[in-house]
Amino acid sequence: MSGDRLEFENPIEDAVSRLRFSPQSNNLLVASWDSYLRLYDVESSSLSLELNSQAALLDCCFENESTSFTSGSDGFIRRYDLNAGTVDTIGRHDDISTSIVYSYEKGEVISTGFDEKIKFWDTRQRESLVFSTDAGGAVGCVTVSGNNLVVCVDASMHIYDLRNLDEAFQSYASQVEVPIRCITSVPYSRGYAVGSVDGRVAVDFPNTSCSSEIKYSFRCHPKSRNGRLDGVCINAIEFSPCGSGTFVTGDNEGYVISWNAKSRRRLNELPRYSNSIASLAFDHTGELLAIASSHTYQDAKEKEEAPQVFIHRL
């Protein structure tokens, strides 16, 4: 295993679902199935906050240094005052809420769920829910980049313009052709990268006229079994914010691999972790990579040992 392991006074008791670094510091959010949202100060190697949420947390995001949000298995969208250590509910989905992101362009929280809804929340308003639209299916993952929101339903990608939400302005089947497990925005371009349940990565630039970097896909985590290549589910994919074109993938067998999207080359593979890679997150400088080694409830063969979070310095 590679990196410094974070120490928690009260161990994380169930699967880690999401890691998120703050946009401007090395504060790290850790959302997990044990109902706790944890805030960890990586610089001082100390736990700053631990808040119970009464439901398994499936995703989290920052608004700023003092405010964050989560989506839960009970459908509720919760807001956390990280300075006061308080939690309140801003609304809910009619089924499990799977994903949550914050749009800095709109100043709104965007959540999705198994109720096939995309919901937009503005906590500055008395009625926080400002818009809701049908996703056309249960949403697996989302990402937001500028004014573009990308919603993944099964193997399809639906792109919305946040300035005009009447309908998706572009919908197409991803190159991976199987259910999409994770998605990330490409920092240096209006594009996206997705990881699939069968170990494929697809990099798409749907709104560019560039010649050579439009779109491509490859099998990123092949494993040889019985004389043939089997794919291993990619649970996490993240681009470095430094604009180098580097991105990392994490799979269900504990491997973290870095790649260069521009040269289409494999760069490095970290020593194998003891459990699945559940989530990855870069800090705002691209110098730190947070890695969650944890079961994910995606594979019956996973080991349900205590989850661990590591910081790898690049």
Swiss-Prot record:
For this chain, the family text in UniProt reads: Belongs to the WD repeat BUB3 family.
Protein name (database record): Mitotic checkpoint protein BUB3.3
Subunit organization = Part of the mitotic checkpoint complex (MCC).
Q: Which UniProt keywords apply?
A: Cell cycle, Cell division, Centromere, Chromosome, Chromosome partition, Cytoplasm, Cytoskeleton, Kinetochore, Meiosis, Mitosis, Nucleus, Repeat, WD repeat
Q: Which GO terms describe its biological process?
A: cell division; chromosome segregation; meiotic cell cycle
Organism the protein comes from: Arabidopsis thaliana
Q: Name one GO cellular component term.
A: Cul4-RING E3 ubiquitin ligase complex
Q: Known InterPro entries for this protein?
A: WD40/YVTN_repeat-like_dom_sf, WD40_repeat_CS, WD40_repeat_dom_sf, WD40_rpt
**Function (record text):** Has a dual function in spindle-assembly checkpoint signaling and in promoting the establishment of correct kinetochore-microtubule (K-MT) attachments. Promotes the formation of stable end-on bipolar attachments. Necessary for kinetochore localization of BUB1. The BUB1/BUB3 complex plays a role in the inhibition of anaphase-promoting complex or cyclosome (APC/C) when spindle-assembly checkpoint is activated and inhibits the ubiquitin ligase activity of APC/C by phosphorylating its activator CDC20.
The residues bearing each WD repeat, given as ranges, are 11-50, 52-90, 92-131, 134-173, 176-215, 229-269, 272-311
On the tree of life, the source organism's domain of life is Eukaryota
Subcellular location(s) per record? Nucleus; Chromosome, Centromere, Kinetochore; Cytoplasm, Cytoskeleton, Phragmoplast; Cytoplasm, Cytoskeleton, Spindle
Gene coding for it: BUB3.3
The taxonomy runs: Eukaryota, Viridiplantae, Streptophyta, Embryophyta, Tracheophyta
Signal sequence interval, chain numbering: none
